[in-house]
Amino acid sequence: QMCIRDRPLMIKEHQRFLEEIISRGYASEISLRYNSNGVLLTEKMIELWTQFKQVKFNVSIDADTVRNYYIRYPTNWNDVMQVLHRLDNTPDNISTSIEVAVQALNAEHLPDFAKFVLSQNFKKINKQYLAEYQAGGGIFSMHLLFIPTFLSARILPQADKERIRSKFMEFKQW
């Protein structure tokens, strides 16, 4: 398995690397895993991925619309949505997960983001993760941001943490 991070879709050599693996006949034995915001995803890359045993594409999104633009400047929300809908319609060997870095800038709004994701009625995004792990998947996957410390949710005042907790409890009942 190959885990590919740090802007793999920006690197021209990456596509050539995948083409070389395919030409040598190894692709059907190799699983790939990507972490990316996905905005540079091309049809050519998806075409190459169909040759591989499995591709897990983790899309880094931390909020919806304007909040995502603020956190992941200069992300264009329309581009993000286009990528998500394209990934939701890929062959079965390609699975997709929305990955959220929980932080001070988005923690309070994650229940709203979850409602937004659910409203999209994705057919396959995060579905494989739900089946594999029996928990955590289904809407999006989360991990905590610790560095830089000034963005960590741990810096929030206790009153803010309680308000956020209440929003999550309300969402749980939703």
PLM regions and their residue ranges:
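C-terminal accessory regions of radical SAM enzymes
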Residues: 119-174
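Core AdoMet radical
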Residues: 1, 5-12, 24-43, 50-82, ...
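Acidic (Asp/Glu)-rich catalytic clusters
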Residues: 47-54, 88-91, 121
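Eukaryote-biased activation of long, low-complexity terminal tails and linkers
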Residues: 1, 17-18, 22-23, 28, ...
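Hydrophobic positions in alpha-helices of CheY-like receiver
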Residues: 21, 84-87, 91, 117
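Catalytic cores of alpha/beta
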Residues: 104-121
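Alpha-helical packing segments of well-folded alpha/beta enzyme cores
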Residues: 17, 80-83, 113
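Distinct, well-ordered alpha-helical segments
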Residues: 13-19, 43-49, 109-111
